[in-house]
Structure formats: C-alpha cells, structure tokens
C-alpha cells in the first residue's frame, strides 16, 4: 500500500531549519515564503524548491495551494527578551498573519513556533488569548508548551513556544517526548578543522577583550566578563542560545585548548577567579586560543547537517543560523505531528 503524503505550507521559512525537520519527518512542502532575499537563496540552494520571496501580506492567501499542515515561526522580535518586548511592534502582528493563512486554507493541523516569552509572560496574555479565541472560532483545538531544544537532540539550550492546533480534536494533540540525552558542545565542535580551512568556514575576527566593569555570576560562563554581548561556551554542556546578532562582538567564543584537551588549564576559570577577588581584569590580554565560533560551528550547534549551505555575506549567514529553528528540534516536533495524522487516518479507515 502506497504511503500517504501529507502536504505542508511553510511560512516565515528563513534558511529552512524548520522545513528541514518537517521534511525529514515525511511532510512535503508545497509552498514556502520568507521576506529575506539571502535566506531565500539559502533555501533554494539546499532544497531545490522555489520559495516565494517577499512580505507574506503581499500574497493572496486564498490562492495558496491546499495543504494538510501549515507550519512556521513568525518573526519574534516584538516578543523577544533579546528585543524590546513590545506587543505593538509591527513584527508582533505577524502571528495573526500566520493565523489568517490557517483560516484561508483550513488545514487539519498547524504548528507555530515563537519565543518562550509569548507563552509565559503576563505582558503578552492579551495577544495569547486573542490568538486562542480566534482559533477556537475557526474550529481548532489548541495546545501550547514551552520546549527546550537541548532535550531534543540539539546541542543548544533554546527555549521556544510551540503552539499546535488541530481541527476539533484536542485529545489527539501530541508534543514530542524528550530524548533523554543532552549533547555537549564539545561533541559537535571537536570534528572541525582550523577556522578558514577544510570543513570550518566563516571565521569571525571580532576582537575579544576583558570588561572594565564585569558583571559577575557564580559561573564564568554567566554574567559578562568581556566587552560586547558574546559569551564563552561551556564545552561540556549544550551551548547557550545562539543569537541572530552574531557576526561581530556578539558572537560566542570557545577555548580551543580545552576543546583539544579537556584536562588543559582552564584560562577562563582563572580569569573569573581573579575578577571575583576584585582584581582589575580590563588590561588582561585574551590569549589566541580563545576565539569566536565560525559560521560552520554555529550551524552545527544549531543542529544543521554539515552539507547544508548558507548564502550571503558572513553576517547574513550568522543571522540566518541564529534565526533558525534547530532542524533536530523541528524533526521531533514534526514526528509527533505525523503520528497525529496517522492516528486520524487509522481511525478513518477502521
């Protein structure tokens, strides 16, 4: 018996991180859209499919192809802790454009990804309720949870709101079960060549310098020991959330000596200990074995396969990576959604 193919519309597709996960789970993307031209170029390069570049609001939603699923992550700067957290930011309205596509196409299911703050903070309670009320009016049962990508085969701590809606079937809504194993950054980064050679492209040369007035925490990997917003990566844990603002002094960095030898002297721990004692660290020279992660390394920490190609300038590529949904995370979500489709069809044919 031929396996049924479930079709999907991908919105706010970016470079295609979420698409990659849903495609690997078995969904067929029949229409995709993003506003950013370089992200669209990356999408075409990797998937060989046409992606419609431009504002989603420029398209006639009724004319989009029929589909079983709509998925995507509307731009989240208006809800993001890293942004201004302004519900009146025009980009905050795009969650409602996503909803309008769902209303026009009436898929069996939708999956929307966004920042955790949209699901947690009282500040956005009105936005949440407006979304839920309209989905209920459209006949969709909806559940949402804040999930952390590190629990789903991704070497990065990245909390995200995942909202799943199904037409008239709340009992069938499933979220993925955690894999039970976290992936430390070291496990991903140790396989790379030297920056700028072989499999390790897109080196970031932004200078790393110690802060004159460091913000200290109990861990050397928290607080702000250095100028700029880039923080060191603890190689023995999944890395911190990678920002879309990477490419300059906001790019995280690693101790390559510890990467090669976990028993090597921990320079960062020593610097942190000095700062805790009140020592002025602002004139301490940062050694050359402390360096910022490359584009290739950032992509790997985001869960992209090594053969995934990014287009545009180095900053374009960092931005595309930081804006992406980690593909392994997306694949686990998509697999849970696929089970919902299969369960529905099993009942229909029994």
Feature map (PLM): residue ranges:
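Class I SAM-dependent methyltransferase "Motif I" SAM/SAH-binding loop
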Residues: 11-15
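Glycine-rich SAM-binding Motif I of class I
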Residues: 16, 20
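Short beta-strand element of Class I
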Residues: 28-30
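Conserved SAM/SAH-binding beta-strand->alpha-helix loop
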Residues: 36
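Conserved SAM-binding loop
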Residues: 43-44
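Conserved SAM-binding strand-loop segment of SAM-dependent methyltransferases
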Residues: 48-55
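Class I S-adenosyl-L-methionine
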Residues: 59-69, 79-247
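C-terminal target-recognition/interaction regions appended to catalytic cores
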Residues: 211-350
């Amino acid at each position: 018996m031929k396996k049924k193919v479930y079709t999907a519309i991908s919105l706010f597709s970016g470079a295609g991180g979420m698409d990659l996960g849903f495609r690997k789970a078995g969904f067929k993307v029949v229409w995709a859209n993003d506003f950013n031209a370089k992200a669209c170029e990356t999408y075409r390069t990797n998937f060989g499919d046409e992606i419609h570049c431009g504002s989603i609001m420029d398209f006639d939603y009724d004319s989009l192809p029929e589909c079983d699923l709509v998925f995507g992550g509307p731009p989240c700067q208006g809800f993001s802790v890293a942004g201004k957290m302004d519900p009146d930011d025009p980009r905050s309205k795009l969650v409602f454009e996503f909803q309008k596509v769902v209303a026009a196409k009436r898929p069996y299911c939708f999956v929307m990804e966004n920042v955790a703050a949209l699901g947690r903070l009282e500040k956005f309670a009105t936005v949440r309720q407006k979304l839920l009320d309209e989905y209920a009016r459209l006949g969709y049962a909806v559940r949402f949870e804040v999930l952390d990508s590190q629990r789903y085969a991704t070497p990065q701590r990245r909390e995200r709101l995942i909202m799943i809606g199904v037409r008239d079937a709340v009992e069938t809504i499933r979220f993925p079960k955690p894999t039970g194993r976290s992936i430390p950054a070291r496990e991903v980064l140790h396989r790379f060549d030297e920056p700028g050679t072989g499999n390790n492209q897109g080196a970031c040369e932004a200078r790393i310098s110690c802060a004159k007035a460091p913000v200290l925490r109990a861990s050397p990997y928290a607080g702000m020991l250095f100028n700029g917003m880039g923080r060191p990566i603890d190689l023995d844990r999944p890395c911190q959330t990678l920002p879309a603002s990477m490419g300059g002094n906001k790019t995280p960095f690693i101790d390559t000596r510890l990467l090669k030898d976990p028993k090597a002297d921990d320079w960062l721990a020593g610097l942190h200990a000095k700062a805790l004692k009140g020592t002025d660290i602002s004139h301490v020279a940062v050694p050359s074995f402390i360096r910022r992660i490359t584009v290739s390394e950032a992509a790997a920490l985001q869960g992209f396969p090594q053969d995934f190609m990014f287009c545009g300038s180095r900053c374009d590529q960092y931005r595309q990576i930081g804006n992406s949904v980690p593909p392994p995370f997306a694949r686990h979500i998509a697999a849970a959604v696929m089970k919902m489709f299969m369960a529905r069809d099993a009942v229909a044919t029994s």
